[in-house]
Amino acid sequence: MTTADTLIANLLYRYAELMDAGRLEECVDLFAHARVVLDADAEPPVVVDRDGLLALWTSLVRIHADGTPRTRHLVGTPIQEVDEEAETATCRSTYTVFQQVDDGPLQPVISGRYLDRFEMVDGSWRFSERTYRADLVGDLSNHLTSRLGL
């Protein structure tokens, strides 16, 4: 992997780490300069910016007594295409979110894909766009306050 590949993959993993820690404000800061597509199939697509994403997460993600959503986001199969000259990149990856609440079972609650775009600004890679795709949806009742049409 090139340096760009590693730095971009680290952005994917940092998102998962911050979300699982319940550090929503730090997590949303990863998208400070990005457009986030929540529903690409809607007409027009549902798109939010950093502040809209924070408002959504704050109202939607259940934070449990330990200060976390009690989740583990596993991000895998990142397929990256980096254009070093243009200082842009795309990445298609998959995610599966596991959750365990109280004495309940550890279970997958949702799985899907992230379709990301990145740009290099002042020598650092950052998200410029993220599209969420939910492919498989389980019991989200302990993770989200509503299903948002999932």
Q: What do the predicted segments below correspond to?
A:
Residues R14-E17, S59, R117:
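Alpha-helical scaffold segments in carbohydrate-active enzymes
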Residues T3, P45-V48, L106:
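A structural signal for alpha-helical segments
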Residues L24-Y95:
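A solvent-exposed, acidic/Ser-Thr-rich amphipathic alpha-helical stretch
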Residues M1-L30:
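Short, low-complexity N-terminal intrinsically disordered segments enriched in polar/charged residues
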Residues I63-L150:
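A beta-strand edge to alpha-helix "cap/lid" segment located at domain peripheries
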